Amino acid sequence: MPKLYIIAGCNGAGKTTASYTVLPEMLGCKEFVNADEIAKGLSPFNPESVAIEAGRLMLQRMDDLLSEGSDFAFETTLSTRSYVKFIERAQAKGYFVTLLYFWLPTPEQAIERVATRVREGGHNIPSDVIRRRYANGIKNLTALYIPLCNYWAIYDNSSADEQIRIIALGGKDITTHIEDTLSYKTVSYTHLRAHETLAN
């Protein structure tokens, strides 16, 4: 059975860093499709200028890998519904879809993480964009993507010592197991609060 891994979380959550460890060492997945890395390849000194082209190339590569039936992973903030149909297509082709979500407790921590990345030479993302993606990502995580994926896990990646903690896991045929009740309730509460904010 081919495998699709979705590495998700807000900007600054440590998705890319975690994926380079988790994917090859723990999951045996060598193919990681990342629009940010594609953009760096196209324009190393100004990756933001080629973001649209990088996104297009990312989607094309994902389609190619899906057609080949290869195992692969991609990175996303889940801030839009755009991957729902792609996941459904993958499952129709027999893929087992795993969602790994790296969570930060607040958008402020995400903003600070991105600011640190910029100071170290990384690419910038405006604070208002980070806040919007943070709220939309958690809303879509709970409302759309968790019910859709075959297996999911939420991790707390907020620790300064880079220790990733499991919050909860579950799946279509897996009973939900909550390891950190307080954090899991916080994720759920953040989703409800984000839904109210977006509705107003």
Identify what each model region corresponds to.
Residues 143-193:
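NTP-dependent small-molecule kinase module
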Residues 15:
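Conserved lysine of the Walker
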Residues 95-144:
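A glycine- and Lys/Arg-enriched "phosphate-lid" helix/loop adjacent to the NTP-binding pocket
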Residues 11:
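The conserved Walker
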Residues 23-68:
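Conserved substrate/cofactor phosphate-moiety recognition/catalytic segment
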Residues 53-101:
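Glycine-rich phosphate-binding loop used to anchor ATP phosphates in small-molecule kinases
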Residues 114, 190-197:
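Conserved small/polar residues in nucleotide/adenosyl-binding loops
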Residues 18-19:
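Post-Walker A alpha-helix
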